[in-house]
């Protein structure tokens, strides 16, 4: 032979087959199995040395040789998803061999013309190998048959259980024995399903993973909404999953048979997956493209987590509120802008949600809504809508985002300063409900990329809420909750406040009277009780969803599947449009729909703003000291409410420009004829919540929340029939910067101050200094929140 090296490419499969057949002819047929086994075992040490194989691998090879009937190959091919891969690999290997045969064809022809000397050399070497084997084992003493001619080119088959054919494989010791009795040594064993009553827990390090994974989050993201449902399931937890498990082609859920008691709390958990819009025609949140593109949504842990995305200037803040006195525990899960806060007044069951835009961009959006519970038991059973505008890392508005903020029962938030948003029992409710022993809890969960689709309802003995937190470097701008409760009280109330969030750019809203219809043609209309339409969603109607009906879930999926073609990024060009948010009408706000409209009269020295609702009155006359305040600021100012708000009582001088320039808008809430004598309007340094984008230096602002002299005209009002006032913050308002102090002075005819101090520092609490505990219209002293960055 030309090359005796085993590594030579000339040593082909056909040649090896020929050598093996010739080798076996030296032994009786009865000994062939034993000869093959001994030969393979003898060569393992050489193989280990030659290929530097690990000991476990060598042990596995020995086990296969000794017990070929337990080889995992057949099990792998029939029981795991790797079947196609193995077959393809075999096919590729065969193709490679065929290709190799073509290269060896010439040499094989030469081989057929080998001289007698070369054949004798081969026979001598085979004889030496046989002598070595004879030293290891004692063959059965039976007369050996005469050796066949060496020129035979075909394999000799036999009736025994072992035979060799070129490029062929047969099982020995029962052909049909494909059992894998060695699963522990099978690296390709199938995934073990989650056992009954077993729940996977996610480590607290997930928050760090999520925080770090958000650094390069694309502006495109998945989103979906849900609604709560009520069921009495007789102490059963139901984990319902609409498929979407990558490793289960049957659309099932790994833990779909799981059922466990929940301390008399009946929780119905539904998982809804919709179009993730990642361009791969796969409507699963957890598909591979999502994993590779960091485009997955994630469910937050009930521990409050601050997830900071420096590139996109987006924070996801999870707020947990708990009041143990009446087992009414709520949580706010919200996706916010740069800064967010939630204010509560326990004495009056009141809360305010306030979110700011991006401090690093001029495209800021600020909005604030306050709520006055007023002991209305139906308040938290209705949906309320807050409008927020979010921006991507390029400063462009994120053009579509719906989200539901769910108020659900939770325990207190995490006390870790690195993740805490609210750390005290914030909300007290006197609501009554007949929903005894009935928890309504809807979880929107996404499975992780480890083939586990978990509705993780891990109710621990510590009464601490637990939920799935899909880490694994999954990230998204969408933020939703997944939670359950554990309380031993049979009168737990879990209701939800659904926040539908729609973004819309108001960056360059043209307030010129010559604005054309085309410039303001796009509008956003909300109707809480009917279909909801948005130009950013191609005016596609979104059906109302009832999670008690599977058909409604399907319609929700169908709705989102229609959104694959929608525009993902707004143009950098200026967009001029009006925004009308109609028929939102949350019960705790007023009986009048809230409407934002850009009907602004810029003529003369007075700027007028009004809303179209018959009962809703806006700022009828805004004085700007002969300067047009809105000319440079380019923002839309609105109000909500009806005549009971007292907003129509604001006099014409309530809104004046500061002496430092028209770009510093002063807000002084003042009721005509009810002043206690303080000249609030002359204090041009006062500014409520914000200052428009301008040359005004934010660090020099020491804003005042202004005196409210009449109890019926309080910013946070709870007297008589007056409803809570909500104040929209202009989108171009510059969020308050570091060390800015706000003082909320609440007087009852004697100018008694109650100070609200906001210290805008990372992970530092804001102190509510209560100077008048007897003032029912003011803040109480136990309120703390963080101004998130």
Curated annotation (Swiss-Prot):
Polar residues bias (residue ranges): 523-549
Q: Which domain of life is it from?
A: Eukaryota
Where is composition skewed (Low complexity) in this entry?
124-141, 151-194, 201-213, 225-270, 291-326, 429-491, 550-581, 602-617, 696-722, 766-789
**Region Disordered: start-end pairs:** 107-326, 426-491, 523-625, 666-751, 765-789
> Compositional bias (Acidic residues) spans?
113-123, 274-290
* Signal sequence, start to end: none
Could you identify this protein by its name?
Answer: Uncharacterized protein DDB_G0286591
Which species expresses this protein natively? Dictyostelium discoideum (Social amoeba)
